[in-house]
């Protein structure tokens, strides 16, 4: 046991002595810096860095490139507003003649318009130069106005008018008409009476009238004296011959 302890002490002393000797042997003064070495070889590429912030817009614009290929068609758009009507196209060629129609039903004369009137002078009022026939004898469908002396057309067509007026003096009368408020050509009839006897001045005509046209009798202011009494009557008449197609 004592031998082992002695051996351990000897080893410790030996190691202490060696460390002390080595420290004294390796210590030397500091040397000067050596010359720079040659550049080393490039290292391996590093890892990819993080994405940087967007840069500012460039000042210059690049040259315009070539036209690209057409893109794919997009979805159909919404219908637009209806446009204005276009101008009428040219008249086309006449079509072939159609087939003959079916024969219609027979007409009923009772359903046809039949305007007609007759009026005489009895106690007429004075209305300028218009000759008033105030007493109505016939006024089918009421075309004649006895307070104005005018016939007003309600059924377009061809009409016959006539008058017979009694006088003991020179007399000049006119059959006058208007259309759309505008006067038309008038027809004049005159009679000279030198003996102061009853004479009849008569006249008549056929007129084509439109709705609203008017017909009446006028007198010449200088030769318009008409007999008025119970011995003879003056009359004004008119009726539709046939309506316009």
Curated annotation (Swiss-Prot):
Residues 79-99 have a biased composition (Low complexity). The C1Q subcomplex is inhibited by sulfated molecules, such as triterpenoid sulfates, heparan sulfate, or chondroitin sulfates. The modification 4-hydroxyproline is found at residues 39, 45, 54, 79, 85. Its main location: secreted. GO terms for cellular component: collagen trimer; complement component C1 complex; complement component C1q complex; extracellular region; extracellular space; extrinsic component of postsynaptic membrane; extrinsic component of presynaptic membrane; glutamatergic synapse. Glycans are attached at residues 48, 67, 100, 146. Residues 1-22 form the signal peptide. Ca(2+) binds at residue 199. Keywords: Calcium, Collagen, Complement pathway, Disulfide bond, Glycoprotein, Hydroxylation, Immunity, Innate immunity, Metal-binding, Repeat, Secreted, Signal. O-linked glycans are assumed to be the Glc-Gal disaccharides typically found as secondary modifications of hydroxylated lysines in collagen-like domains. Residues 28-114 are annotated as: Disordered. It is found in: Secreted; Cell surface. PROSITE patterns: C1Q. Residues 31-109 form the Collagen-like domain. It comes from the Eukaryota. The modification 5-hydroxylysine is found at residues 48, 67, 100. Core component of the complement C1 complex, a multiprotein complex that initiates the classical pathway of the complement system, a cascade of proteins that leads to phagocytosis and breakdown of pathogens and signaling that strengthens the adaptive immune system. The C1q domain is the ligand-recognition domain, which specifically recognizes and binds the Fc regions of IgG or IgM immunoglobulins. The collagen-like domain interacts with C1R and C1S proenzymes. Core component of the complement C1 complex, a calcium-dependent complex composed of 1 molecule of the C1Q subcomplex, 2 molecules of C1R and 2 molecules of C1S. The C1Q subcomplex is composed 18 subunits: 3 chains of C1QA, C1QB, and C1QC trimerize to form 6 collagen-like triple helices connected to six globular ligand-recognition modules (C1q domain). Interacts with CR1 (via Sushi 24 and Sushi 25 domains). Interacts (via C-terminus) with CD33; this interaction activates CD33 inhibitory motifs. This is Complement C1q subcomponent subunit A. It comes from Mus musculus.
